[in-house]
Amino acid sequence: MITTRFAPSPTGFLHVGGVRTALFSWLYAKNNNGKFILRIEDTDLERSTQEAVDAILDGMSWLGLKNDGEIYYQTKRFDRYKEVIQELIADGKAYYCSCSKERLEELREYQQANNLKTGYDGKCRDANYIPQQGESYVVRFKNPQDGVVSWDDAVKGRISISNHELDDMIIQRADGSPTYNFCVVVDDIDMAITHIIRGDDHVNNTPKQINIYKALNANVPVFAHVPMILGPDGAKLSKRHGAVNVMQYREDGYLPQAILNYLVRLGWSHGDQEIFSIEEMIKAFNLEHINASPSRFDFEKLKWLNKHYIKESKFDDIQTEVEYHFAKIGLDISNGPDLKELVAVMAEKVDTLVELAEKSSYFYSDDISYDENAVKKHIKASTGEIFVKLLENFEALDAQQWQDPDVLYNIVSTTAEQCQVGMGKVGMPLRVAITSSGQSPDIGITLKLLGKNKVVARLTKALEELCK
């Protein structure tokens, strides 16, 4: 069975590069009816935090990238790592090393001064050293000294590294803790991982890991090293480019559907298709069409996709996110129009859900502050007379008539005729009175969504406060 994994370290936030790796791994497993494993690589005890673990889990949940089975934590597998280390020592494939930090520093200085390759010189490799109680030691892996390590990378093609370039790496530190390159191999073997999709910053780790697979007589998985994501300027993606906690995109009003759709096309292609549902991603995804070159993060493209999903999604699919943003700014959605109807009207005017909530606030909050520029521009000496006539005409409408935007628009038009002014002399002051600014959807639709009671109350307030 095809089995992939996403194995983040909880030493920082989950950013878009990590999300894309997780997405590619998840899609490949789903495309092949396989399994997707989530493993938290928390062996760095000093830097790993529960806060970072929670952020990773929250991000994966928000995006809908559900793992199969339990979530694995490396810190709960230390006994297993120690067991395998002892097996390697017993088989002569690893050894105890007593070299002090001072000796290793002197060795490195000597190598650098003489333009030699830096790395461990193998002093303890064949010394058959057995540590005595109280002595400080590490355990090193016996890397092959001859030949090359080669693999056919699913993205980068054939890669070969001479074993002469690799030294005997430490697999157990002096404090007894196992090291990253060793742990991941044991994990991937035990979890039957068949395909490892990860960032190309791991390419240099791969030959070391392959040698450990071989030493443990295990099958070597397929590696697919995905190029990094660059900022719009071609520099390494940083916080100013968007390398922030993926949950910040939620706070900024982006839909998970838009994030996933954007990231799947960032370095992978399927003809000219730009819009993908989750089902379409799963059906189309493969490793062959991952681009070997880095991709640039394009905020405008992400914003365009987000607008598309706000406009085109079924309301049920985005309702939770919409309600989240309305609640975030303190809006009571029970005190206004049906949210589904509102989104259908406002979607064309916004790029994010933050904009949607902010630009729709007057529909739900009666605590509105008039825009001074709009008041100055549209409220004139004659406006009071117009408001009086509007109130008179609106009061005459019954509940059924108020549900028809065309009827409401015609009332505004009729009022303009009655007051012998142009439509703009009525519509714009009316907008200011009922929305606090000069901007809103079509006036008939705005009136319908606000409802008769709100419109009458706000017109009355405007008449008292703006038309003195």
UniProtKB/Swiss-Prot annotation:
It is an enzyme of class 6 (ligase). It holds the Pfam family tRNA-synt_1c. CDD domains: GluRS_core. It catalyses: tRNA(Glu) + L-glutamate + ATP = L-glutamyl-tRNA(Glu) + AMP + diphosphate. GO terms for cellular component: cytosol. Keywords: Aminoacyl-tRNA synthetase, ATP-binding, Cytoplasm, Ligase, Metal-binding, Nucleotide-binding, Protein biosynthesis, Zinc. It is found in: Cytoplasm. Zn(2+) binds at C97, C99, C124, D126. Binds 1 zinc ion per subunit. A motif ('KMSKS' region) lies at residues 236-240. A motif ('HIGH' region) lies at residues 8-18. GO terms for molecular function: ATP binding; glutamate-tRNA ligase activity; tRNA binding; zinc ion binding. GO terms for biological process: glutamyl-tRNA aminoacylation. InterPro entries: aa-tRNA-synth_I_cd-bd (IPR045462), aa-tRNA-synth_I_codon-bd_sub2 (IPR020751), aa-tRNA-synth_I_CS (IPR001412), aa_tRNA-synth_I_cd-bd_sf (IPR008925), Glu-tRNA-ligase_bac/mito (IPR004527), Glu/Gln-tRNA-synth (IPR000924), Glu/Gln-tRNA-synth_Ib_cat-dom (IPR020058), GluQ/Sye (IPR049940). Its EC number is 6.1.1.17. ATP binds at K239. Its cofactor is Zn(2+). Signal peptide: none annotated. Belongs to the class-I aminoacyl-tRNA synthetase family. Glutamate--tRNA ligase type 1 subfamily. Catalyzes the attachment of glutamate to tRNA(Glu) in a two-step reaction: glutamate is first activated by ATP to form Glu-AMP and then transferred to the acceptor end of tRNA(Glu). Monomer. This is Glutamate--tRNA ligase. It comes from Francisella tularensis subsp. holarctica (strain LVS).
